[in-house]
Amino acid sequence: MTNKSSLSYKDAGVDIDAGNALVDRIKSVVKETRRPEVMGGLGGFGALCAIPTKYREPILVSGTDGVGTKLRLAMDLNRHDDIGIDLVAMCVNDLIVQGAEPLFFLDYYATGKLDVDTAARVVTGIAEGCKQSGCALVGGETAEMPGMYHGNDYDIAGFCVGVVEKSQIIDGSKVKAGDALIALASSGPHSNGYSLIRKILEVSGACAETTPLGDTSLADKLLAPTRIYVKSLLSLIENVDIHAVAHITGGGFWENIPRVLPENTQARINSQSWQWPEVFNWLQQAGNVSTHEMYRTFNCGVGLLIAVSQADVEKTLSHLNACGEKAWLIGDIAPQAAGDAQVIIN
C-alpha cells in the first residue's frame, strides 16, 4: 500500500447506495403489476414467467422501443411522471396489433448521475403502463455511467414479450378489397415526431408551458401519455374477426399502413371523417408544415387502424365505444391499380 488515498466506485461517479435506494422505492409499485404466471420477485439474475395455460398452441411475440426525443422535452420541462407510460405503450401497442397479449416487460434506464427521485417517478410511470396493459414489470437495468450523459440527462428503453394463439395471429393476410377501416383516436402525438415538434417550438419561439391550447397548455397536449389499446383490442379480438391492425407511429400513415396490407391492395382514407385534434393544427400552423408531411410524421389523431369486413363495422364500433375508445369509420380497402400508392388520403 502507498500513501495515496483509496478510491471507491462512488469516487468514479457510480453510487451503488443510490441504486439500492431506487430499488427500495419502486418495489411496491412493481409488485402491483404482478401476474400469476410470474415466478420469483425482483433481484434475480433473470425473470421467470410461465405461459398462461389457456393457450393451446402459444406463439411468443417480442418487441422493444423507446420514446425518442419526447424524452428531451419531458426533461426540459421536468415532467417525468408519464414518460414511463409512453415507454410501455410503444412496446405493447406493437404487440397487440398482432393479436398478442403482453405478458411481461423490462426496462433499461441509463444516466450519467442517478437521481433517485427522478428515476422513481419514471419507473412508477412504467408500472402504471404495465397495469394499463395487464403485463408484469419483471425487472430492468439501471445504468449509472459517468461521462456518457450530460448532467441529469437519462435515456430509457423498454422490452416486452407477449403471447398469441397461433391460429389467432393477426398478420394482414385476411385483408381484402371491400374491407372497412376503423380508426381509434390517439391521445396526442403519442411518442413520435418529437424532433420536428421541438424544431417547431424553437423556430416559433413558443413556450410550451405558457402557450394556451384549448382548456390546458401546449405542454400538457404535447406530453399527454401515449394511449394504450391493449385491453380494448383483446376484448375486440374475442368478438370480431379482425383482418389487420396498424399502429400509427414513426412514419405516420404513409409508412405504417402498408406494413399490414397484402400486395395489390390499397387503403383509402377519408380525411373528412375526423377533425385533427387542436395540437396537430397548432403544429402545422406554427411550423408551416405541409399536410403531406403531417401525415408522414404524426398520427394526426389516429392511434390505430383496424381492418374488418363491412358486415362487422357496426359491431366493431359499438364494442370499441363500449370499451371507452373513440372509434369511427375512416376508410376502406380497394384493389391497387398499377402505379398507385398503397395509401390514398382523400
UniProtKB/Swiss-Prot annotation:
EC numbers, comma separated: 6.3.3.1
Q: Where found, per UniProt?
A: Cytoplasm
Tell me which family the UniProt entry assigns to this protein.
Answer: Belongs to the AIR synthase family.
Q: What class of enzyme is it?
A: ligase
Q: Which GO terms describe its molecular function?
A: ATP binding; phosphoribosylamine-glycine ligase activity; phosphoribosylformylglycinamidine cyclo-ligase activity
Query: NCBIfam families attached here?
Result: purM (TIGR00878)
Which keywords annotate this record? ATP-binding, Cytoplasm, Ligase, Nucleotide-binding, Purine biosynthesis
InterPro entries tied to this protein: PurM-like_C_dom, PurM-like_C_sf, PurM-like_N, PurM-like_N_sf, PurM_cligase
Q: Which reaction does it catalyse?
A: 2-formamido-N(1)-(5-O-phospho-beta-D-ribosyl)acetamidine + ATP = 5-amino-1-(5-phospho-beta-D-ribosyl)imidazole + ADP + phosphate + H(+)
Q: Which residues form the signal peptide?
A: none
Q: What's a GO cellular component annotated to this UniProt protein?
A: cytosol
The UniProt entry, under Pfam families, shows: AIRS (PF00586), AIRS_C (PF02769)
Q: In which pathway does it act?
A: Purine metabolism; IMP biosynthesis via de novo pathway; 5-amino-1-(5-phospho-D-ribosyl)imidazole from N(2)-formyl-N(1)-(5-phospho-D-ribosyl)glycinamide: step 2/2
- In which broad location class does this protein mainly occur, judging by the first location in its UniProt entry? cytoplasm
Q: Which organism is it from?
A: Proteus mirabilis (strain HI4320)
Which Gene Ontology terms describe the biological processes this protein takes part in? 'de novo' IMP biosynthetic process; adenine biosynthetic process
| Annotated protein name in UniProt | Phosphoribosylformylglycinamidine cyclo-ligase
